[in-house]
Amino acid sequence: MPKHGKKYLEQAKLVDRDQVLEAREAMDMVKKLATAKFDETVEVAFRLGVDPRHADQMIRGAVVLPHGTGKSRKVAVFAKGDKAKEAEAAGADAVGAEDLVEKIQGGWLDFDVAVATPDVMGLVGKLGRLLGPKGLMPNPKTGTVTFDVARAIQEIKAGKIEYRVDKTGIIHAPIGKASFDVQKLLENYQTLLDTLIKAKPAAAKGQYIKSITLSSTMSPGVRVNPLKPHALLVQQ
């Protein structure tokens, strides 16, 4: 059981763990609880009615949040020739092929997302043991294995996030910063929620979205009503 600091415990007293709020109320609460000296990240956790041990219930993908996450992301691109030039022009932070593979094998990992063109995936495969555990391996399901490198880079820089259900059936994702206004956070939240609803596996039975919890980096979680997935953005 992790130990929490005095400030967290004081904040926890303000949150009724049995109370389930509408999304706007929950977002207001999270913003009030985000009192750290840095701009805390607002995160959401969806507990889904899936069993990720079965391949047909694994949920993984990516979505561009309309207002981004508030965090700048460094992009490394594995590509050759014209595609390498295209990546550089699009604002990639590192571009290469064999040379980039060697650099990473040497311990360099100063990037947040990796993109690769399909023709160099044989090379990138050598980095599986290094990049895989860190969630940095390019993957067609998240749009990071593509010949359209310019678009991939632009989407990532604009606020594209990847999501993946963990072994307990939960998806954790950042949806912005505490400094964002509530409406922007809600629109990011709604975009991700709509994406997950569309991604519901046919094999998933029973209630799909079992619970939703919002929190900031340092705050306790605030529960959101999972039975009202739409009409969440109406101004109060």
UniProtKB/Swiss-Prot annotation:
It comes from the Bacteria. It holds the Pfam family Ribosomal_L1. Gene3D superfamilies: 3.30.190.20, 3.40.50.790. Keywords: Repressor, Ribonucleoprotein, Ribosomal protein, RNA-binding, rRNA-binding, Translation regulation, tRNA-binding. GO terms for biological process: regulation of translation; translation. CDD domains: Ribosomal_L1. GO terms for molecular function: rRNA binding; structural constituent of ribosome; tRNA binding. Coiled coil: none annotated. One of its GO terms (cellular component) is large ribosomal subunit. HAMAP family: Ribosomal_uL1_B. Part of the 50S ribosomal subunit. Belongs to the universal ribosomal protein uL1 family. Binds directly to 23S rRNA. The L1 stalk is quite mobile in the ribosome, and is involved in E site tRNA release. Protein L1 is also a translational repressor protein, it controls the translation of the L11 operon by binding to its mRNA. This is Large ribosomal subunit protein uL1. The gene is rplA.
